[in-house]
Structures are given as C-alpha cells and as structure tokens.
Amino acid sequence: MSYTLGQLAAKVQGVVKGDADLVIDKLGSLENATSKELSFLANSKYQSLLGTTSAGAVLVKTDELAQLVDNAIVVSNPYLAFAQISHLFVPTTHSWSGIHQSAVVSPKATIAENVVVGPNAVIDDDVLIAEDCVIGAGSVLSRGVKIGKGSRIYSNVTLYHDVEVGEACIIHSGTVIGADGFGFAPNDGFWEKIDQLGSVIIGNNVEIGANSTIDRGAIENTQIGNGVKIDNQVQIAHNVVIGDNTAIAGCVGIAGSVKIGASCTISGGAGIAGHLSIVDHTHITGMTMITKSIDEAGSYSSGMGMEPTGKWRRTAARIRRIDEMAKQISSLGQQIKKLSDKG
C-alpha cells in the first residue's frame, strides 16, 4: 500500500508543503520513521524532534512548523489526520475468503454477501450476519445473534444467544458478550441462581478490546450506545447502560444497573458501584472508585497518588489518627474561644 503525499493530503483536507509526489509506504513515529514513512506532531513538547527526524513527511499544524522539515502536510488537527490516514494502511488480517470449509454453519443461519467466516468458527441457528462482515477463526455466534454491516469479529470471540451487534463494530479476541450476569438470591444460607433473561444490544461503530466481558441483562437488556470505545479487560455487568461516544480504558469494572451518560471518559482501573447514574460529559480519572451517583459534569478522582514509600507510610499513619486529630483540633478550638471570650 503506497500513496503520494498529495493523495494523503486530499484524504484529510490538508495542504502539502514540499514534494506532493513523494511516495509514502508506511506510518511511523518521529523518532523512528524512515524516508518513506509519514509521521505527525500533535504535542508541542516533541517539536525538537522535527530537527532530527528521518520521516519522509510530517503532519503538522502550522506553516511555521512545516518549514522545519523537508515535506509536510499542514492540517488543523494532526492527531486526527493521522488517525484518518491510518485506515489506509491496515494490512489484511486473514488469508481466506468466503466461508472456510472447517467452519460449522447452521442451515438456519442467514449470511449476506461478501462475508468472511474463518476456520473452526461456529454459526448457530437463526444467526443473521449482514454484508461485508468478517468472523474470525474459532469465534462462536450462538443462536439468534445479529451482526450489522461491516463489523469485524476477531478470532476466539464468543457471542451468547440473542446478542445484537451494530454496524461497523470491532470486537477483539477473547471477548465474551452475553454471559449470565451475576445474579443470585439468598436462600437459607445458599444461593438461588436468577436466570438472566435479557440480552446485550451494541450500537454502531463500537470497538471492544481483547478479553473484555459484557454480561446479559437479568430482565432488561444491557445496552452499549453508538460510538462507544471499550479497552481490554473491562467488565460490564448486567443491565448497564452506556451512552453514545463514551470511552472506557482498561481494567475498569462497572457493577450492575449502572447508567453512564454520553461522551464520558473512564480511565484505567476505575470501579463503579452498582445502581448509580453518571451524567453526560463526566471524566473519571484512573483508579477512582465511584460510590455515589454523579449529577454534574466534570472531572472526578479518588484515592492517593504515588509518593516515596517512606512518605506514603507516614501519610497512612496520620490517616489512621485522623479521628483523634479531629478531636484534638476541636478541643483546641474550644480552648482558644474561651481565652478569646475572657479577652
């Protein structure tokens, strides 16, 4: 896959500074790109690398920055332009076409044109796969699953019965969608299983990382909105609703019946307790524990950041004494007030 600099500039509505006929074969970082590769500068703290990079061309924001390299594409948002151009250089991820002979496909399944089904995949009864989809090797689409146009299911993904995936979605390997939610009723010292009768409904243009899990609803469906991006090893429990264009980083755990608004970001390792609501445009920093609903947009954090071990131990020791210290401060305040009253 090769493109001229002029072709790439047209793709992102950019302006070429330099040789528009320069052929670009790959994308690369400013540190390691070669003369046939395109890089980008999105953060000014890396501007010094423009003087040392071997990249054939660089995506930059201003004409002034373009003057620091031999060839450039000037765009308003270099990082976004880099993302858009990256789609042109995606390699083919499978070496077969059509339905592989080792795949197990039910005669009751409906598979549209231009669908690829990999080796040892299983397509159960009443599955509906729209056109231009790719189902990777070893993936299992259980009874009644629906996959929208242009979606890609990588190898060894499991979709339980009646799960629905929208158009242009990407689901990475090892992900399990539609397993039973964690529902049990206490019964005289034992646990009675609550069968999970809902499903999981995933919107359009959703990406789900490797080894993530999304549980089916107990009665109502678990719902993932359009444009949602979910990183690796994320757990989403039953009946959760996630609004459009929310992004969730790795190792986040979301307990049952949580409702998360649109355009939120949840950073890595955060935990959200069950039955809470979070409004649109809320941003949760890494390792934060959410224990109550958030009804005002903004950035929220909890916990303590890293310190040298000795300092952290002293801080922890003081935290253990916080009740005692509060009483001492209150007592001192009362003594000061008495002295002031005597005046």
Swiss-Prot record:
Pathway: Bacterial outer membrane biogenesis; LPS lipid A biosynthesis
Top-level division of the source organism's lineage: Bacteria
EC numbers for this chain: 2.3.1.191
Catalytic reaction annotation: a UDP-3-O-[(3R)-3-hydroxyacyl]-alpha-D-glucosamine + a (3R)-hydroxyacyl-[ACP] = a UDP-2-N,3-O-bis[(3R)-3-hydroxyacyl]-alpha-D-glucosamine + holo-[ACP] + H(+)
Keyword check for Lipid metabolism: yes
Protein's GO biological process: lipid A biosynthetic process
Active-site residues from the entry: H238
Keywords associated with the record: Acyltransferase, Lipid A biosynthesis, Lipid biosynthesis, Lipid metabolism, Repeat, Transferase
Class in the EC hierarchy, top level: transferase
UniProt similarity note: Belongs to the transferase hexapeptide repeat family. LpxD subfamily.
Function, as annotated: Catalyzes the N-acylation of UDP-3-O-acylglucosamine using 3-hydroxyacyl-ACP as the acyl donor. Is involved in the biosynthesis of lipid A, a phosphorylated glycolipid that anchors the lipopolysaccharide to the outer membrane of the cell.
Stored NCBIfam families: lipid_A_lpxD (TIGR01853), PRK00892.1 (NF002060)
Subunit text: Homotrimer.
Protein name stated in the entry: UDP-3-O-acylglucosamine N-acyltransferase
